[in-house]
Curated annotation (Swiss-Prot):
Entry binding sites for Zn(2+) 1: 258, 260, 263, 268-269
Binding site for S-adenosyl-L-methionine: 328-330, 371, 397-398
Organism (species): Mus musculus (Mouse)
Protein name (database record): Histone-lysine N-methyltransferase SUV39H2
Entry's Gene Ontology cellular component terms: chromatin; chromosome, centromeric region; heterochromatin; nucleus
Primary location group: nucleus
Family: Belongs to the class V-like SAM-binding methyltransferase superfamily. Histone-lysine methyltransferase family. Suvar3-9 subfamily.
InterPro entries per the UniProt record, alphabetical: Chromo-like_dom_sf (IPR016197), Chromo/chromo_shadow_dom (IPR000953), Chromo_domain (IPR023780), Chromodomain_CS (IPR023779), H3-K9_MeTrfase_SUV39H1/2-like (IPR011381), H3K9_Histone-Lys_N-MTase (IPR050973), Post-SET_dom (IPR003616), Pre-SET_dom (IPR007728)
A molecular function (GO) term: histone H3K9 methyltransferase activity
All residue ranges annotated as the SET domain in the record: 317-440
Gene: Suv39h2
């Protein structure tokens, strides 16, 4: 059974962008002077005049910066399936260029209706002058140098006003400077905090959109940080399945499959492997920890509704990556109730050799971070490293009294050296409750003394446990 090594918090994904591939070549239409100007990408940034500026309703950022697409391709890009390419020009820059050249482009949100409207991105500061309340506005798609003071009566962005007020109260509560609440102007430190909080909120929203674009399962992913100003990890890439390191091959095609008409009652894939069916009629796991799960695979004749296809369907629950307040970094909580013995998520990452894991383990231990998960169901040849490549499970914290249990799963790849790692609930988990598993969990559900006593990588540094459970062992490793 797989054993997870001690892990800590790391970094996050660089910006990705979307671009829609263009249609087949068509006879070129004669370009107008306006289109030629747009294609040169030389339009200068201009500041909106006071007469033009209008504080419209705020709309959430819907994605990371996008590639520059002009001409016919820009107009028709939304009709084609998006794919990732390196960023060329930011979305804000594209929007500004379109407004400058009076061009519309639905794929980047510029229409005839909003072409001349200026949108509030966030509020930076506050003051009262001659009895009138003013807010310093950061305009979406415009640099900070174009920020302007606008009277409250001109602002139609209740959510941003509410966020501004909440951020101010949060800062004052943290600093215990409650006397400044009714001041006619904000102290520079408060204004700076509010701006940083607004920028963090935008960055987390972009990251949340990135995660949901990358996932291939039903459950949605949300992100929140109400604790500090930390933004998304900078060097983390979301993947949905194992990523083999160079020199490692993972067979993705099954060698045999069942021909059952009813996999719940007929002799099925588990029987062929010498084990029992892992699930009951309610799709809950019924086997003991340490027993492998053999699901139906791509060669089986049964359909997607087969009762022996659970892990391969992916996470069905909406989860939230959140910043913990107890010093454990990022964590994961469920937003819906999860029944006991239900599949929650799969642990994925980069598959490396045990020798490479020892080398990386030294580096990670010196930095106080590691996401190494040993695949030792039968042998100890491979390890999953989720430090840079992983899914939501990358952020799940340790607990000595966890609510998730580890199981080894075999679907298309039947190589016992490379089981897939599934996490099932051990009890009913209520909405809002943090998800945890034991980093030293073995098939029996107990800590592996062998792993702790004999692993050279784990002898180097002992990481203190902060789970707070009554049965806490004191250390993660």
């Amino acid at each position: 059974m797989a054993t997870a090594r001690a892990k800590a918090r790391g970094s996050e994904a660089g910006a990705r962008c979307h671009r829609a591939p263009g249609p087949p070549p068509r006879p070129k239409a004669r370009r107008t002077a306006r289109r030629r100007r747009a294609e040169t990408l030389t339009a200068r940034r201009s500041r909106p005049s006071a007469g033009e500026r209008r504080a419209g309703s705020q709309r959430a950022w819907s994605g990371a910066p996008r590639a520059a697409v002009f001409g016919d391709e820009c107009a028709r890009g939304a009709l084609f399936k998006a794919w990732c390419v390196p960023c060329l020009v930011s979305l804000d820059t594209l929007q500004e260029l379109c407004r400058k050249e009076k061009l519309t482009c639905k794929s980047i949100g510029i229409t005839k209706r909003n072409l001349n409207n200026y949108e509030v991105e966030y509020l930076c500061d506050y003051k009262v002058a001659k009895g009138v309340e003013y807010y310093l506005v950061k305009w979406k798609g415009w640099p900070d140098s174009t920020n302007t003071w606008e009277p409250l009566r001109n602002l139609r962005c209740p959510q941003l006003l509410r966020q501004f007020s909440d951020d101010k109260k949060t800062y004052l509560a943290q600093e215990r400077k409650c006397k400044a609440v009714n001041s006619k102007s904000l102290q520079p430190a408060i204004a700076e905090y509010i701006v940083q909080k607004a920028k963090q909120r935008i960055a987390l929203q972009r990251w949340q959109d990135y995660l949901n674009r990358r996932k291939n399962h039903k459950g949605m992913i949300f992100v929140e940080n109400t604790v500090d100003l930390e933004g998304p990890p900078l060097d983390f890439y979301y993947i949905n399945e194992y990523r083999p390191a160079p020199g490692i091959s993972i067979n993705s095609e099954a060698t045999f499959g069942c021909s059952c008409t009813d996999c719940f009652f007929d002799k099925c894939c588990p029987a062929e492997a010498g084990v029992v069916l892992a699930y009951n009629k309610k799709q809950q796991i019924k086997i003991q920890p340490g027993t492998p799960i053999y699901e139906c695979n791509s060669r089986c004749r049964c359909g997607p509704e087969c009762p022996n296809r659970i892990v391969q369907k992916g996470t069905q629950y909406s989860l939230c990556i959140f910043k913990t307040s107890n010093g454990c970094g990022w964590g994961v909580k469920t937003l819906v109730k999860i029944k006991r013995m239900s599949f929650v998520m799969e642990y994925v990452g980069e598959v490396i050799t045990s020798e490479e894991a020892e080398r990386r383990g030294q580096f990670y231990d010196n930095k106080g971070i590691t996401y190494l998960f040993d695949l030792d169901y039968e042998s100890d040849e491979f390890t999953v490293d989720a430090a840079r490549y992983g899914n939501v499970s990358h952020f799940v914290n340790h607990s000595c009294d966890p609510n998730l249990q580890v199981f080894s799963v075999f679907i298309d790849n039947l190589d016992t050296r490379l089981p897939r790692i599934a996490l099932f609930s051990t009890r009913t988990i209520n909405a809002g409750e943090e998800l945890t598993f034991d980093y030293q969990m073995k098939g029996s559900g107990e800590a592996s003394s062998d792993s702790i006593d004999h692993s050279p990588a784990k002898k180097r540094v002992r990481t203190q446990c902060k789970c707070g459970a009554e049965t806490c062992r004191g250390y993660l490793n």
